Amino acid sequence: MKIVKEALAGTAESSDLMVKIAPAAGELEIEIYSDVIKQFGDQIRRVVKETLAAMEVYEGLVIIEDKGALDCVIRARLQSAVLRACEAQPLRWEALK
């Protein structure tokens, strides 16, 4: 999926996260800010990369502001932001697991 506009998903509440996504030329850039980065940073990054790969997102800027979200919340918020940022492209529903 090609990111064509900026999009947001999520909140800055406890146990949630805010996902900001924007178009960018070149490779995918992921920035993660988290209160629990030392304990769970590797897992957060893994979930983000797996979700973006499943949705075939290979370019863009993704900023994650995490407040202790579970993996399922990270996936859902990221999927929402990507779908909003892709606008009218045909959706591959099977990629949303």
Swiss-Prot record:
Q: Which NCBIfam families match?
A: citD, PRK13253.1
Oligomeric state and interaction partners are given as:
Oligomer with a subunit composition of (alpha,beta,gamma)6.
Residue numbers bearing the O-(phosphoribosyl dephospho-coenzyme A)serine modification: 14
What UniProt keywords are attached to this protein's entry?
Cytoplasm, Phosphoprotein
Q: What is its main location?
A: cytoplasm
Q: What is this protein called?
A: Citrate lyase acyl carrier protein
Compartments in which it is found: Cytoplasm
Family under the similarity heading? Belongs to the CitD family.
Q: Which gene encodes it?
A: citD
Q: What does this protein do?
A: Covalent carrier of the coenzyme of citrate lyase.
Supply the Pfam families for this chain: ACP
Q: Which GO terms describe its cellular component?
A: cytoplasm
